[in-house]
Amino acid sequence: MREFGLITRRLVTALLVGLGLMASTTIAAAEAIKVAAIYTLPVEQQWISRIHKALNTAAERGAIEYVYSENVANTDYERVMREYAEQGKQLIVGEVFALERAARKVAKDYPNTAFLMGSSFGPVGPNFSVFDNWIHEPSYLSGMVAGSATKSNVIGMVGGYAIPEVNRLLHAFMDGARAVNPDVKFIVNFIDSWYDPPKAKESAFAMMDAGADIMYAERFGVSDAAVERGVKAIGNVIDTSGDYPDTILASAIWHMEATIDKAIKNVSGGSFEAADYGQYSFMAYGGGSLVLDEKLVPADVVKAVRDKEAEIMDGLFRVNVNDQRPVSDN
């Protein structure tokens, strides 16, 4: 349900499934920790949606009591953090890429509150932990699919911002494509927005006009352009193949559950401390995966991709991490 006050938020109450005994319900509720999340975008946005999904899953099993605020302006973010801390939330989750210094200042003022924030920088003791969607591994695999599928040998890539968290995914995708197709060329553009589907769509059309027949959809809007032009696309973070049938060849999926569950366990056990939770987005921890449409991807390509996936999972192949801004090929 939605609460109204200084902050507009929704409260997700844990759904306690059991025998229906009052005693059992009371015990489960007492064990649930109080968690708040702060989002600068709507929970429907792809990156935010994965965090929201993981927290909802934890709430549904009775592990947490979950409230959240969405569409919080950067200028208001610090105030919202402080309000949740004052309310006694035990764990506060969010993303502070645009306000790193302010967020760390709040954490310092509330040393008994656990903070887990999407961040470009490192953790700060005793209570400020960081995470990111390290899905470079499935991004590499999706690149293999794209490199095998292109006929024009031109792939278009539309990103949000050229920050390390985005750059590394694009580079991994490019490396995967080049591994199976050394002749492939890339057209790269950043729209300087996390959510502007019309702008992303316009950028995608320009790339198609320049010869791209496969589109890497790091942002919403690109797949819509692909559908209109009848070209194929690669998804990112979430699986949108149901929304774009016969268009999405493969997608690199981010699963935030491993990260959230680790943080909840640490808070519940009194062992939460400043740490980098990034590794829990790796495939080995279940934080990343590849989905592909076997109706659209040839069997030999599927096998090659799955074989490489097994190598990654077994520690026999390591995807390179490159945080530098990717550029178009000449």
Residue ranges and their predicted role:
Residues T13-S24:
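Bacterial N-terminal signal peptides
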Residues P123-V145, M157-A162, P245-A258:
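Short beta-strand elements at the ligand-binding edges of bilobed clamshell
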Residues K108-N133, V237-T247:
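Flexible loop/hinge segments that line or gate small-molecule binding clefts
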Residues A36-A37, K89-V96, L116-G118, A210-F220, ...:
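Periplasmic-binding protein-like
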